[in-house]
C-alpha cells in the first residue's frame, strides 16, 4: 500500500471509531512522517468514501488549522471531483471559517493570496457555468466562504504576495457580472476597511523638528501599565507588577528601588497612584468588563500600599510624614473628570460633585479606601485619614472596611473560620446562609493584607477538604464564589488562579462514589457544582490545564493527581475536548449504550430516576454520556417514537440541581444544532430544538434571583453562546420567544461589557455602544466583539491618535481618552503593519506642518512600543503577532526613504527604541525573555509537604491549548488558527 491507500484506510478507521479531529490530524502527521509525504492528497482523503460531520471536521482541520492539506488543492479537488458532496461540505467549512476568531493572525504567507484568487475564481466560474446545479454549488460557496473571503481581503493589505489592489478590483469586477451582491460586499470590505487612499506628502514637503523627551510621559506610563491587562494569569500577581515598576523606574547606580534616594522613591509613589487611577478611569470610559474594573480597584486598594511598603521597608516617622504628603497630594490632586468618573461609578450624583468643597462629596469611594489601606499596611500614620480628608466630613469609621473578618457582627479569626468551615453542618440551610457565603461576601470589605491572608487560608482549606475527601464544603465554596465574581477577581490578585483550579481538578480526579451512598442526588449536585466552577475559572482567567503540574502539590505529604497525571488524562480535559456530539454519540461502548438506555427509560417512563440507576454508573460516566442522551432523544422524536410533550417532560429532570451541572455540554450541543438546522432553510425539526432550549433555559419563575445556584452557574458560562445561536435562528425566520432572550440578557451583559445588552426593533442582534474590544464566555474577557465602527479601520485609528494628541497638547488634563489599544493591535493585524505605520507616519508629517509634530511622535511611538511589547511577550489567546513586525518595517522605511521622510522615520525609530529600552527590552531584537515577570512565592501552600519542590513536571501528553478548549471553541475545532505553507507555493493553473 502506498501513502494514499494508507491515508484512505486511516480515514475510514478513524471515522468508524469516531476519533476526534485533533487526534486524526496527529495520526495523519505521524503517517506522513513514516511515509515521507509532505502533504495530504485530497483524492486519498476523499477515497474513504464516507461522508458525515466528523469527516467535515477532518477536512477543516487538515486544510485550515494544521495546513497538511493546501486549501487551494482542496478547492480544486472539490470543484472537479466532489459535486455530490459540495454543498454540505462547503456550508460546514464556511460556518467554521465564519466563526473563526476574527483577530487570529493570518501571517505574511503567499498561500493566502492564492486562496483569495481561488475563492474568487471558484465562485465566478461556478456562477458563470451553464446549468442550475453548478450555479447552486456556486451559491453555496458564496454563502459559505463569503465571510472568510471578506476577512482575508480586508486583512492582507500589503502582504498580498503579488496580488495588488488593482488585481483584486479586476477580479471583483468579473465576479460582479455574475453576482453583484457578493462582489459588492467583498469590494466594500476591501476599500472600506482599508480606508480611502491619500496622496503621501511626507517625503518631500514636511520638516520634522521634533523634540524627544527623556522622561516618561503620562500617556506612555498609562498605556504601559494597562498592558498588564493583556497578560496571562501570572501577570495578576504582585511580583510581575513590581517587576514592571522596577524596570520602568530603575536608576543607574542603584540596584533596587528601595536603595534610591528618598525623593526618587516618593516620586515613584505619586506616579504609580496617578497611573492606576488613570487606568481605572479608562475602564470606565470604555465601559469595560466588571473583571477589569475589579482588577484596577483591587490594585489601588492592595497593590499601592504594598508598593509603598517595598519602597520604604523600614520607614521612619519622618518618612511616613513625607509619604503622607505625597499620597495626599496625589489623591486630592486628581483631575476633576477623573473624580467625576469615580463618583459616577458608585452611583453618586454628578451635581453633588460639582458643588462639593472636597472633590467627591460625602460618599466613600476608592480614594478613601486607598488611604485606609495604607494605614492598615502601616505605611501611613493612624491619623493620616482625618488629616487628608479633614474638609470632606468623612471619618475612617464611615468606611465599610476592616482589617479582620467579621461574621454576623462578630470578629472571627482565620483559625476559627477554618475550624468552623470543617465542622459546619451543610445538610440544613441554603447556600446563602452557610458560613462560606458569608466569608466570601466579606472579601471586598477587607483591607489588602486581610484579603490576601483570607485568600491563602481559603486555598489551604480547599486543599485540605479535597485531600480529606470532604466534598460538600468544596461544593459550597464553588457555589459561593461562582455567585460572587468580584470576590473571585480579588482572590485571583492574591494567589494565582491556577492554584484554585488545581485544587478543583484534584477533587474531580479523586472523586469516588461511596457504595453505601445514602443520597445520590446530593452527590451528583456536589460533583456538578465543582465541575462547573472549574470550567468558569478556566475560561475567566484563560487557564491551561497542561500547566497545572508546574505548581507542585497542594496536599500535605503526598502528591496530588494534577501534579503527576498527564493533562490529557484529566477528566476535565476529557470533558472539554470530547464533549463534541459527533465524536461520541454514534459510537458508544456497550457500557455507555447500557447507561444511555437506562437513563432514557427513566426520563421518559413513569418510573423516574432511581437510586439504582444512579448507582449503576459513576457521575463521571454520566457527564460524558449526557450529550448522547439528548442526541438519541432528538432522533427518537424525529422518527415519531417520542412525542414532544414526553420529550420535554423528561428534559425537565435536567432542571433539577443534581443534573444541571451536566448540561454545560448539552448547551454546547444545542447551539451546534441551532446552527445546523438554521442552514437548512425551512426545517420542521428547528422548532423542536428551540423548544428544548427554552425548556432548559426558562423556569416557572422568571426571577433570576430564585434560580438554584447551580443553574445560575451554568447559565453564566453558556448564556452568550446560546443567545447568539437563538438570535441566529430568529434572523433565519424561526420563532423564538422574546422572554428567552430577556431571561438570558442579564447573564450576557455580565459576561461581556458593563453595558446592557438590548434588542432593537429593527434588528434582532446586539445593540452595542462599543466597537471591537475584549469580552468573553464565562466572563473571560477574550471573545471579540464584531467591528461596529462606521468609518474605516485606519480612520478610526487616526481618530484615536488625534484624541490622544489633543489630550497631550492640553498638558494631560482630565482622564486619558478611552482609547482601544486592543482595537489598534487588531487593526495592525488586519491591515498589515506596514500600511498602518505608513499612515501614522503621514499623520506625523502633517501634524508637524501644523506645529504639533512632537505630540504626534509621542503618541505614535507610545502606541507602537506598547503594541510591540504586548505582541512579543504576552501569552494570551490572541498574541497580535503582526505587531512584532513594526520595528522591522520601520527599519526598512529608514533604509529606503530619503530627505525629510527619512528624518521622521529615524526620529520615530529612536523614540520607540528609547521607550523599549525604558521598558526593559533590548533594541537589537534580542529582547529580554518575555514579559517582566517575577516568580511568585507559593510556599504558604507547597511547604506543607516538607519535600515537594515547586518545579515543573514533564508532561508528555503533547496536549495543546486547542485540545483543552470547550466553551471557547467552535464546533469540532479550537481557537488557534494557524497555517504554515512552508514557503512559496507554485500556483497551478486550476482554471
From Swiss-Prot:
A single BP term in Gene Ontology: regulation of transcription by RNA polymerase II
Annotated Gene Ontology cellular component terms: mediator complex
Function: Component of the Mediator complex, a coactivator involved in the regulated transcription of nearly all RNA polymerase II-dependent genes. Mediator functions as a bridge to convey information from gene-specific regulatory proteins to the basal RNA polymerase II transcription machinery. Mediator is recruited to promoters by direct interactions with regulatory proteins and serves as a scaffold for the assembly of a functional preinitiation complex with RNA polymerase II and the general transcription factors.
Subunit structure: Component of the Mediator complex.
MF terms in GO: transcription coregulator activity
Family: Belongs to the Mediator complex subunit 5 family.
Pfam family, one: Med5
Keywords attached to this entry: Activator, Nucleus, Transcription, Transcription regulation
Record-given protein name: Mediator of RNA polymerase II transcription subunit 5
Compartment annotation: Nucleus
